[in-house]
Amino acid sequence: MFARMSDLHVLLLMVLAGKTAFGLSLLSFLTEPDPDWTPDQYEYSQEYNNQEENASSTTAYSDNPDWYYEEDDPCLSNPCTHGGDCLVSGATFTCRCPDPFSGNRCQNVQNKCKNNPCGRGDCLITQSPPYHRCACKHPYRGSDCSRVVPVCRPNPCQNGGTCSRQRRRSKFTCACPDQFKGKLCEIGPDDCYVDDGYSYRGRVSKTIHQHTCLYWNSHLLLQEKYNMFMEDAEAHGIGEHNFCRNPDGDKKPWCFIKVNNVKVKWEYCDVPACSALDVANPEGRPTEPLTKFPEFGSCGRTEIAEKKVKRIFGGFKSTAGKHPWQASLQTSLRLTVSTPQGHYCGGALIHPCWVLTAAHCTEIKTKYLKVVLGDQDLTKTEFHEQSFGVQKIFKYSHYIEIDDIPYNDIALLKLKPVDGHCALESKYVKTVCLPDGPFLSGTECYISGWGVTETGEGSRHLLDAKVKLISNTICNSRQLYDHSIDDNMICAGNLQKPGQDSCQGDSGGPLTCEKDGTSYIYGIVSWGLECGKRPGVYTQVTKFLTWIKATMEKEASF
């Protein structure tokens, strides 16, 4: 029923195993008294019984604060970039770099274009042999762009454009159909940018002064901060093309251009901003509400100031209302001998009637399932709680488990209205926003939950912890998940200090990242190995936005 019941620990609460975990938490108890903090019963019953052993743990930690990290494998965090292999060499490491990369961490890109002129084209660096190629200007062809082909055969004009030859054999023009433009009629009527264009993924490759953009993998850009070989290039929409992008959050999309055949500079692009109508209703659909139940005034905003309270097993006891979209999935069934009725998975409220969770949390029939919102202490019924039955479960159709690893691990729960309404907005119950684009590796995000999974106990209080997003390249290294992470998954944790941040969430609970003061659900707690030692693995919500919205809209029509 659950993912990896044996050796796969789905983000368990226990962060540092055994007595040593207690040594870390007890020290903070003694040095930072907090009159508002109430310890968990679980904490007392499981960790406070053997005072002699606990005292010795504390002493060991005090004498050597780096005790936990002394024998860390230097390759654990895979410091080698660009798919390099990390080799342990005594107390340090060396990186074995694939072509065309070099450097002590494979951070440099070798310029394979130095002795390979492209004539009527631009030389590009590639990641496959011979690690360079020529991007020829039409109508030139060949490995060095020296051969000329007929300019209009085959027709280079796209989207039904008509090609006309000019006097010079290499010159031509495209007569574009209505609403299409560009040298090859490649730019459609919907090619525009929203806000500052950070999420722009169109095909404009001309600047406002009509200069042609350089390819992002041009050899001329190897020394630039932004190119195809930068970390998270794909998340920025940067690849082996020369389309305008805005990776640094400038005021609009831009690109690099070549000046005097040598010098590189940048210019803003000739791409229009989308009109207000396009932004509000990009597909021209009737602007009907999603359901008959009104949505909340806003999403992803809290009314609670962050308050740092006593650390509990590597996480923090969360302030009530700090994660108002947090949902507790509870069942009236006893799932296993060690798991009683009650809370068993987490979720996130994305609409008054909809909760997002993991597919592997939805093997229970709706009649045995309820969702509690605004919950802080699982042992109490609090005044700000709202409880709902589940009307329907929508599991993603391609969800599957292979070798105990859940793929496409996402599901939607449609809540059953109470007294004619679903969730009511309050300080303690709010919706989290769906993301409109990717977040970068290294972004600090939150996981939250009670730390309860199907194989162990957790805290009675809602916990949270900060984690950092980790690129799939690093997460797929041999030292971590060895190519088990697919494009619909993301990793998050703390590679420098493992053990303090990977186990506070519940299966199905939210990984939320913030932008401009608004929280977005970027991941769903899915699975992991060696809890506290490797990053947690999450379903990447941006990969399923179309399915989420289509499912909710379809149900709204009933």
From Swiss-Prot:
GO molecular function terms noted in the UniProt entry: calcium ion binding; serine-type endopeptidase activity
Record-annotated Peptidase S1 domain positions: 312-553
InterPro entries reported for this sequence: EGF-like_Ca-bd_dom, EGF-like_dom, Kringle, Kringle-like, Kringle_CS, Kringle_sf, Peptidase_S1_PA, Peptidase_S1_PA_chymotrypsin
Keywords annotated in UniProt: Cleavage on pair of basic residues, Disulfide bond, EGF-like domain, Glycoprotein, Hydrolase, Kringle, Protease, Repeat, Secreted, Serine protease, Signal
Domain of life, per lineage: Eukaryota
Site residues (Cleavage), renumbered to this chain: 478-479
Glycosylated residues (UniProt): 54
GO cellular component, one term: extracellular space
Kringle domain location: 191-274
Top-level EC class: hydrolase
Signal peptide coordinates: 1-23
Modification after translation, per record: Proteolytic cleavage at Gly-23 or Leu-27 can give rise to the 50 kDa heavy chain (HC) and cleavage at Arg-311 or Lys-317 can give rise to the 27 kDa light chain (LC). The HC can undergo further proteolytic cleavage giving rise to a 26 kDa fragment. The LC can undergo further proteolytic cleavage at Arg-311 leading to a 17-kDa fragment and at Arg-478 leading to a 8-kDa fragment.
SMART domains for this protein: EGF (SM00181), EGF_CA (SM00179), KR (SM00130), Tryp_SPc (SM00020)
A Pfam family matched in the record: Kringle
Cysteine disulfide partners in this protein: 75-86, 80-95, 97-106, 113-123, 118-134, 136-145, 152-163, 157-174, 176-185, 192-274, 213-255, 244-269, 299-433, 345-361, 353-422, 445-513, 475-491, 503-531
Tagged with keyword Glycoprotein: yes
GO BP annotations listed: blood coagulation; proteolysis
Residues annotated as domain EGF-like: 71-107, 109-146, 148-186
Hydrolase found in the keyword field: yes
Family (UniProt): Belongs to the peptidase S1 family.
Biological role: Cleaves the alpha-chain at multiple sites and the beta-chain between 'Lys-53' and 'Lys-54' but not the gamma-chain of fibrinogen and therefore does not initiate the formation of the fibrin clot and does not cause the fibrinolysis directly. It does not cleave (activate) prothrombin and plasminogen but converts the inactive single chain urinary plasminogen activator (pro-urokinase) to the active two chain form. Activates coagulation factor VII. May function as a tumor suppressor negatively regulating cell proliferation and cell migration.
Assembly mode: Heterodimer; disulfide-linked. Heterodimer of a 50 kDa heavy and a 27 kDa light chain linked by a disulfide bond.
Designated name of the protein: Factor VII-activating protease
Record organism: Bos taurus
Lineage: Eukaryota, Metazoa, Chordata, Craniata, Vertebrata
